[in-house]
């Protein structure tokens, strides 16, 4: 990949590169449904109890930044190419140390959370920051605020794991982590795909797929159903999509901590009955959506995909996330186990063709359906974060660890569900981020959560239970 010579505002010439499709989508979504700079913030912290060496952590962070090229990513405006990206070869990053030991835990949490709500100047400026934290209750660790055009949830976790491994190498002689992979190699792979036979094959597949499928159906998470209202408003009794994307971005979170016992019950059922964890979680979610929509059998969920299968993709950082609709039509006579197979089959179709650019995918989908850009058949987005082991000094330190994702108070998604595992005990943390522009959203999301996990636990306890029995138990 030949670099593009780009000129910065100070006259300096840098080697720059085009944006990937995933980055272009982030810009598209931000410009159309975001526009508040903090919308692109990822704020997260990892904290633990026990002996903590601040200076060794400072050294580890500095090495981690040098090893992870996307932390040093910058963007520049170019008259010919629009927005380009370039890497600062060496950065003297300011690693601030913050002492909150004199505060309560809640006071500290609110202050740290407020950092995540502050946007940064985008072009030709550092986009990512990291702080060494000393918290109440004997907790120490690191907080990062990263830009979503430079990191996604997966690469954020890998970056933190790399720093913690370097720290343990310095502190107790643990093995030094293997090298990270070059970010630009991943960019090259993404750009090469666009001109590849595989891209042409994927496009042909999706064209045929949409032409041979019936129109999907919008299943709302609001009890004041938007589809029913739009059918009346537009005098379209057969309408199956909704106009629900707006530039109102203010959001809040509802967070639920599922017990280690219940989480282990779900994982055990998956292992014993050969069900995928993400399939079981999605079936619980689709069951709750079905219950909210008069037991609708045709449910679509927008699934966020990390696209990190190769070593290069796992260790190169950056943002590779794309999202695709996973549609499942499940009749009530199917068992829970059989219904997971329906979801997994639909999900596998997406996985095999998930490198195709999402915006082009939406165009192909809408070209054979009635929805247009800004209208959707998916009421929410779901992301499952499989466990990524973070290194700790010993089991006691690991048990004390706390990982926190701080809401930036802004979202481009109407409803975004993330389910991840706690480092301390591997239990599920369930994070619902909802927008404030819909009355009653918080109450409805809380009800949706209860019904989702009731369905999940019923299926984990008895994978042979009928879907109709689950819907009877979780009906509104």
Model-derived features: positions:
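Acyl-thioester-dependent condensation/acyltransferase catalytic cores
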Residues: 65-145, 150-154, 161, 165, ...
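Short amphipathic alpha-helices and their capping loops
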Residues: 1-34, 59-103, 126, 182-251
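Hydrophobic "lid/gating" helix adjacent to the active-site nucleophile
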Residues: 61-76, 268-315, 460-467
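Acyl-thioester-dependent acyl-group transfer interface
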Residues: 3-25, 29, 33-42, 54, ...
